[in-house]
């Protein structure tokens, strides 16, 4: 019993002692964990202050300090070099002259992190388990998602992981992990594989062997790249390599070459004004001369001639030019053919004559156009959304009001009127409208005689004014932008008769200044497509520029409305000389109609001595002058084939087919928007200038010789006038050629020979009066475009060889096209003034690709491979 009692007492004492030791150990562990937590919190708070200002990630020992003493992580500096091809401080924009590897580390940062790492940890028991590895959320953002090696020994914590409690990491792990994203970054760069060896033909070319991996830095054009291989930069032909990871697509942007400001800011609020050297984003193409863009928070349209586009913007412009316009224009040109089989083969549907097929085709065109339409105007946001909700959308697209926002609205009504063509146009008997002039052999007829116009009574539709309009006659109604108007009647010439819902005042106003708010769904009643037209729609369709290949170039607003039903065209082809009656709202004009496809004439119309156009019509005819008080109707004139004055009248056998070209806005090709057309018209003295016309066969009281002499006098006077204007504005005068590649330019020589020396082939592209001009400038003749900066844009759109041909003919090396370049030496340093310019240092070698007529060169620096603009007076050839 005594032994048992002693054993029991001993066991109780041992248990009590063990319990005390356990409590002491537990308290020590709790105190150690609390101390570690406080220490980790202090270190985490300290490290939160040590972060990169670009990516907001924590800095480590691989961070680099710039000469301006700003410190950034290595990954951000490498990404800046890859994207910009130069290194500038993100804080103060100071240019760094050395590479990222040559930059020193921040000694203060390294010592601070090293002190944290070497500081002894308190409260860690020898038997405690090693700290866990950092979770996926710790270094994944810094190291690009790559974890460190699992076997590395634990060091002091760098920062606290939210997912793993007391997980820590070490600076040695950071150094290990930082090598992974660098290699990963290099693998994510755009690169290509060499298909052949290239030794280089000129200084500055990059030499490489077959199978080499070349980092692509920049695409010079379709045939040449600028790349890097083993630290060497140079040019390489595109046909010698195969792009594995292509270059990223840049934003479609353009640099302003000139100042663009509108004179009347109230009526031209939709125009995007800018100054020289500003960079704007290109949204879409409006027509052949205008595009929609964005500058800051403002969206508007601007002339393409005023902006130098980059490659992405050029591709966007070409897609907008070819996809919507070429498709519909090609179908329309095919419908002009008299061969029914040709019409059936090109027709978009089997039942083109029905309104359902036309609306389906129109929806396909609209969807293709709206696929790239990322922005729209504020004034059209409500009405445009409501119009897209309709099942049959026959109203005018957004490109129609954009087309006329900053041009003469009377001229734009002729082009935009194609939206009001009827699906079922009844034919009229030409014998009931008086005499019809006899057409020349293979020439177009003209229907413009007087009569009564059938008017369609519309329902009480409410329209929204898109633009302000000031009345020019007593019966016209003033339009204010944003106000509602009720349309009572719609005239054939594009004018509406209605009343203001706000004031109740009634009158006539241009229909292209308003857009319908209350639309009738379906293809049925009360819309502009249900008008009964007395003129031939073929006269309005001839506003496109046809080419021998069968396609045509026209504005999107015109081309989108060119898909006409088969019955309409057949009826009007059977009656090419239908009469045009006039009503109370209709103003009289001359409307040329095409007798058949492939006519040999250029439809023109002339002013008689006491005859002037009073209202804009949907035809291609000269504008009325502002100073003409006459409201007399103009008689129908027969267009004749334009021939050289030395040869007189030609026989039908001598009249070879030529494409028809409109002359509706000849002044738009010679008058830049910043040259005041009002001043020009004031110097003319209000004398209306005749349209582009040749001696007519109609007896108007003038002999051919007298008319020829009068035309010469007007030509010489206008040449002197514009010569003085161009001298004053030479520093701001834009190039008058389209910046996009136009296949029509190859026809200028043949057209010049056929038209004679008196008329120069001024061709325009669908936007009537591309810039705000007066109608006195509309009939400018004999003026060559001012090719001042025609070579300022890179128009080399040659196609690179296909990959199939390259692989099938691997044994044959393609011959690369030579890149035009000349070696120049910089004699005076030049600091860049904008993003498009490059910095020149004395002694640098520059490869000049293009020389602009204003003295600026476009070239590539051999030192860093950057391409841009620079003044030619700072370099010399050697």
Curated annotation (Swiss-Prot):
Q: Give the free-text PTM comment from the record.
A: Autoubiquitinated.
Q: CDD domains per the record?
A: RING-HC_SH3RF3 (cd16750), SH3_SH3RF3_3 (cd11925), SH3_SH3RF_C (cd11785)
Keywords of the record, alphabetical order, are:
Metal-binding, Phosphoprotein, Repeat, SH3 domain, Transferase, Ubl conjugation, Ubl conjugation pathway, Zinc, Zinc-finger
GO BP: positive regulation of JNK cascade; protein autoubiquitination
Which intervals hold domain SH3?
A: 187-246, 249-312, 458-519, 819-878
Q: Identify the Pfam families for this entry.
A: SH3_1, SH3_9, zf-RING_UBOX
- Which top EC class is given? transferase
EC number per UniProt: 2.3.2.27
PROSITE patterns per the UniProt record, alphabetical: SH3, ZF_RING_1, ZF_RING_2
* Gene3D superfamilies found in the cross-reference section: SH3 Domains, Zinc/RING finger domain, C3HC4 (zinc finger)
Q: Where would I find the RING-type zinc fingers in this protein?
A: 52-93
- How would you summarize the oligomeric state and partners of this protein? Interacts (via SH3 domain 3) with PAK2. Interacts with RAC1 (GTP-bound form).
Domain note? The RING finger domain is required for ubiquitin ligase activity and autoubiquitination.
Its biological function?
A: Has E3 ubiquitin-protein ligase activity.
PANTHER family, alphabetically?
CAP, ISOFORM AC (PTHR14167:SF116), SH3 DOMAIN-CONTAINING (PTHR14167)
Q: Which family does it belong to?
A: Belongs to the SH3RF family.
The protein in question is named: E3 ubiquitin-protein ligase SH3RF3
Protein's organism: Mus musculus
């Amino acid at each position: 019993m005594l032994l048992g009692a002693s054993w029991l007492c001993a066991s109780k004492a041992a248990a009590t002692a063990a319990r005390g030791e356990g409590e002491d150990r537990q308290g020590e562990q709790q105190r150690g964990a609390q101390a570690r937590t406080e220490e980790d919190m202090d270190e985490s708070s300290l490290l939160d202050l040590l972060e990169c200002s670009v990516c907001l990630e924590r800095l480590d020992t691989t961070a680099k300090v710039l000469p301006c003493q700003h410190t950034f992580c290595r990954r951000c500096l490498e990404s800046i070099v890859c994207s910009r091809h130069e290194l500038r401080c993100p804080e103060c924009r100071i240019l760094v002259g050395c590479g990222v590897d040559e930059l020193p580390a921040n000694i203060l940062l390294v010592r601070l992190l090293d002190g944290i790492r070497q500081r002894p940890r308190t409260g860690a028991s020898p038997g405690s388990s090693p700290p866990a590895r950092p979770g996926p959320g710790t270094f994944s953002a810094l190291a690009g998602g790559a974890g460190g090696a699992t076997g590395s020994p634990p060091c002091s914590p760098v920062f606290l992981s939210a997912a793993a409690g007391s997980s820590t990491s070490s600076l040695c792990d950071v150094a290990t992990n930082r090598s992974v994203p660098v290699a990963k970054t290099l693998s994510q760069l755009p690169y290509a594989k060499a298909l052949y060896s290239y030794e280089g033909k000129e200084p500055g070319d990059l030499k490489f062997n077959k199978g080499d991996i070349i980092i692509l830095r920049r695409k010079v054009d379709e045939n040449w790249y600028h790349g890097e291989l083993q630290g060497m930069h140079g040019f390489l032909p595109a046909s010698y390599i195969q792009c594995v990871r292509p270059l990223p697509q840049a934003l479609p942007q353009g640099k302003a070459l000139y100042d663009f400001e509108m004179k009347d800011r109230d009526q031209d609020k939709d125009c995007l004004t800018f100054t020289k050297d500003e960079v704007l984003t290109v949204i879409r193409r409006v027509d052949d001369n205008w595009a929609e863009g964005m500058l800051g928070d403002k969206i508007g349209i601007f002339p393409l001639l005023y902006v130098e586009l980059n490659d992405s913007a050029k591709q966007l412009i070409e897609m907008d030019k070819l996809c919507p316009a070429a498709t519909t224009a090609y179908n329309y040109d095919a419908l002009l053919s008299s061969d029914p089989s040709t019409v059936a083969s090109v027709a978009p549907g089997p039942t083109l004559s029905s309104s359902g097929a036309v609306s389906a085709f129109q929806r396909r065109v609209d969807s293709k156009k709206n696929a790239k339409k990322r922005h729209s105007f504020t004034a059209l946001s409500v009405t445009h959304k409501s119009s897209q909700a309709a099942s049959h959308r026959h109203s005018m697209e957004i490109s129609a009001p954009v087309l006329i926002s900053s041009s003469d609205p009377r001229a734009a009504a002729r082009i935009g009127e194609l939206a009001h063509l009827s699906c079922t146009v009844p034919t009229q008997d030409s014998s009931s409208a008086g005499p019809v002039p006899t057409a020349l052999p293979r020439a177009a007829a003209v229907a413009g005689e007087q009569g009564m116009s059938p008017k369609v009574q519309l329902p009480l539709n409410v329209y929204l004014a898109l633009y302000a309009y000031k009345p020019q006659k007593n019966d016209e109604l003033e339009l204010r932008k944003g106000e509602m108007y009720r349309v009572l009647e719609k005239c054939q010439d594009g004018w509406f008769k209605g009343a203001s819902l706000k004031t109740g005042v009634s009158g006539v106003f241009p229909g292209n200044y308003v857009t319908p708010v209350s639309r009738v769904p379906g293809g049925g009643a009360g819309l502009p497509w249900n008008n009964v037209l007395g003129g031939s729609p073929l006269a309005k369709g001839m506003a496109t520029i046809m080419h021998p290949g069968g396609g045509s170039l026209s504005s999107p607003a015109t081309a989108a409305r060119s898909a006409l039903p088969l019955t309409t065209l057949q009826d009007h082809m059977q009656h090419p000389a239908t009469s045009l009656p006039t009503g109370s709202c209709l103003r009289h004009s001359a409307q040329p109609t095409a007798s058949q496809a492939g006519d040999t004439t250029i439809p023109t119309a002339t002013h008689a001595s006491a005859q002037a156009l009073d209202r804009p019509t949907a035809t291609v005819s000269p504008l009325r002058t502002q100073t003409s008080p006459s409201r007399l109707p103009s008689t129908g004139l027969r267009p004749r084939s334009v021939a050289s004055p030395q040869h007189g009248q030609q026989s039908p056998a001598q009249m070879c087919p030529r494409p028809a070209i409109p002359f509706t806005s000849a002044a738009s090709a010679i008058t830049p928007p910043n040259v005041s057309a009002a001043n020009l018209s004031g110097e003319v003295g209000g004398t209306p200038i005749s349209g582009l016309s040749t001696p007519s066969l109609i007896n108007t009281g003038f002999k051919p010789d007298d008319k020829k002499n009068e035309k010469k006098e007007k030509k010489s006077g206008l040449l002197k006038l514009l010569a003085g204007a161009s001298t004053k504005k030479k520093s701001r005068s834009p190039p008058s050629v389209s910046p996009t590649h136009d296949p029509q330019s190859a026809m200028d020589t043949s057209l010049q020979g056929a038209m004679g020396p008196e008329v120069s082939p001024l061709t325009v592209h669908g936007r009537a009066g591309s810039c705000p001009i007066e109608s006195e400038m509309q009939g400018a003749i004999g003026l060559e475009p001012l090719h001042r900066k025609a070579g300022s844009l890179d128009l080399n759109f040659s196609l690179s060889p296909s990959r199939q041909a390259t692989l099938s003919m691997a044994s044959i090396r393609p011959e690369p096209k030579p890149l035009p370049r000349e070696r120049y030496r910089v004699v005076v340093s030049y600091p860049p003034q904008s993003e498009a310019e490059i910095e020149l240092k004395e002694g640098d070698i520059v490869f000049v690709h293009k020389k602009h007529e204003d003295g600026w060169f476009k070239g590539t620096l051999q030192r860093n491979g950057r391409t841009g603009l620079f003044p030619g007076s700072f370099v010399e050839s050697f």
